[in-house]
Amino acid sequence: MKRILIVIDMQNDFVTGPLGSKEAQNIVQSIKEKILNYISDGNKFYFTKDTHDKGVYLETLEGEHLPIEHCIRYTDGWDIVPELKEFTKDLASYGINRNEILKNHFGYEWWSEYFTKDSFNYEFELVGVCTDICVITNALLLRTYFPESKIIVDSSCCAGSTPEKHKAALEVMKSCHIDVI
């Protein structure tokens, strides 16, 4: 069984920036420990990065609903938080060619670029922010692409846009056969 950790959008803007929260700040150390466990067990991990271009975001549907510019490509807010950034540098030592996955929507539509679609030997674990937006979207996309794979969301390593929405998203994921721990 291949165990794969997917760290969703742990970027400065979502942790300490304009969309940050105390809850997001509180999960950083737990995510770091989880990454270290994956490394010591020889498993792979990936980061998704919410990515928007300057001057375009506010014209998108997302920008209409959430008119707060964030994760603008090549800004400090776009970067992975400093406590986790070290895990994006020396990729060869982790046996990974590229572990930052850029996406300009809630979910990444091309998971099959990274993982063989017909393989049932994957166990995906998701952590990060926001539980009720990007975590749930990617969990459901993985469920769609890999219907027989085990998908886990570690609720103690996730934060939602509000605590209430975090809890609601976890319940929805449970009903879609995603293991919430």
What is the predicted role of each segment?
Residues 1-100, 150-152, 167-175:
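Active-site acidic carboxylates
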Residues 23, 69, 127-128, 157-158:
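A generic structural signal for short
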Residues 88-91, 133, 143-146, 177:
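Short, well-ordered alpha-helical segments in soluble proteins
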Residues 2-4, 139-160:
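Long, low-complexity, intrinsically disordered polar/charged segments
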Residues 100-137, 159-181:
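Conserved N-terminal glycine/acidic-rich loop preference
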